[in-house]
UniProtKB/Swiss-Prot annotation:
Summary of subunit composition and partner proteins: Interacts with STX17. Interacts with STX5A. Interacts with the COG complex via COG4.
Protein name per Swiss-Prot or TrEMBL: Sec1 family domain-containing protein 1
Residues bearing the modification N-acetylalanine: 2
Record organism: Homo sapiens (Human)
GO cellular component: cis-Golgi network; cytosol; endoplasmic reticulum membrane; Golgi cisterna membrane; Golgi membrane; Golgi-associated vesicle
Amino acid sequence: MAAAAAATAAAAASIRERQTVALKRMLNFNVPHIKNSTGEPVWKVLIYDRFGQDIISPLLSVKELRDMGITLHLLLHSDRDPIPDVPAVYFVMPTEENIDRMCQDLRNQLYESYYLNFISAISRSKLEDIANAALAASAVTQVAKVFDQYLNFITLEDDMFVLCNQNKELVSYRAINRPDITDTEMETVMDTIVDSLFCFFVTLGAVPIIRCSRGTAAEMVAVKLDKKLRENLRDARNSLFTGDTLGAGQFSFQRPLLVLVDRNIDLATPLHHTWTYQALVHDVLDFHLNRVNLEESSGVENSPAGARPKRKNKKSYDLTPVDKFWQKHKGSPFPEVAESVQQELESYRAQEDEVKRLKSIMGLEGEDEGAISMLSDNTAKLTSAVSSLPELLEKKRLIDLHTNVATAVLEHIKARKLDVYFEYEEKIMSKTTLDKSLLDIISDPDAGTPEDKMRLFLIYYISTQQAPSEADLEQYKKALTDAGCNLNPLQYIKQWKAFTKMASAPASYGSTTTKPMGLLSRVMNTGSQFVMEGVKNLVLKQQNLPVTRILDNLMEMKSNPETDDYRYFDPKMLRGNDSSVPRNKNPFQEAIVFVVGGGNYIEYQNLVDYIKGKQGKHILYGCSELFNATQFIKQLSQLGQK
């Protein structure tokens, strides 16, 4: 039983840890990286393409790279000077143009030795191209290692991953749902998704049991992934799933469940105005790959009349796992975040004053007998204060960071009345009585941008059982056009709804999920950084979104019409027969939900909240691309133009 417990602990070794371990091993010339080794690291350069850069940047900081001996990290296609006495570690996709450039590096004898690591498996023919180039350049002995790393996915959280950031339009919702997509193009999209999912499971060290809905892109992914896993398991000598793949062995003593869902089962959630911190940051700010970019205006004070306003400073902040405030509050409702930032600031000020006081005591002259007698009592205190100084400075950095980020979010909430949108949409999605008419909000010039209004109307249109009459729809369309909205997204959603109506009933979103709590108390203090006047303090009630509900049915083996006809694949079974859902229906302990067609932080947060109530269970959320509502509306608009 102890072994089983240890295996479950290994399951908790998150995908982030596993991918980080794999990267560190690669940077250590594919030898396991030992944390406490005393020797100096071997100095080397890291050469990556944009794909490699996107995989590494959310996981390893520049300081961590330096600790691993990376003195320089350069893009493969940048102009690079020769450094003939230093080894180079390459981390790139095995594309034609990347291979050509690597062969050119060999010919130009840029580095002492070459460790070639491919993000995804390289084909035999491309490998031969490299071998020929090495031969021609008399550099065979310098090519030290060639490795397939199977790391073709991006980990953003301990329990969240996305397929790619570069070329994401290739696997986007629009790409999959284009009416004019050819079979060959669709095959390419599916192969791209399957390649990444295969890499994900190799890194996880587990072969999943796969469930998916029928007649969707998710089913096409399931069929191809099952085949790819099956072929790899059959080739016992070269199987990537035998033995100790990454130090932590198998995922756990029980295999994980992979639930493949199609974006089309729920188009309302990606358009929804949200109320939790991380999802809001993604919705209203420029936030991707865990980095938020803010524009801070440097003001126009004291500038002579008619002078140009000063340029806005761009600032970027990394929101990482070591940021305790972010880890604790990224899923909290926004007013709670504002309150917590304020509390942190006050506790920091108290500590800061203490340090100043102790420092001034130490600086006093000897004549002051009172001060000298206090000195001995205070030495211990001062030592602890000074030793905690770096910690205090880090705390101050995080407080400043979150003050800036939360202030930027708050500006959007107030300027666009996002609390009103959030509350109203929640009522629509949960079929609660609406307190004011939809037309009033659309026609209110002070409530939100044209895009906010379009999002609200689309959610109403998607969620309503009975589509509005033609006359009503014309009235809504006129109000939307008057508000400056582009009607293309509605065009697409109308076609989509007509199509899904034939297929199935619309997704239900459960009962009401918010209750207004009056305005904030603490944060309303005049001393607060955040003037929350007029912003509702809405408290969230846990309510499962469609993706979470589907996962719950399949993970707990519940019988439900929504998921009863989901296909079942077990790549370890000799004959692939999807009708054979096993009779012994044991609930799963670990599951991966993957959304084909794009995901969002609202769904991710909903799953995180759901699993909190399930002891000893783990969930990972993945998606083919991560978009916010603005990016999603743009795709719907392009589809509506067709």
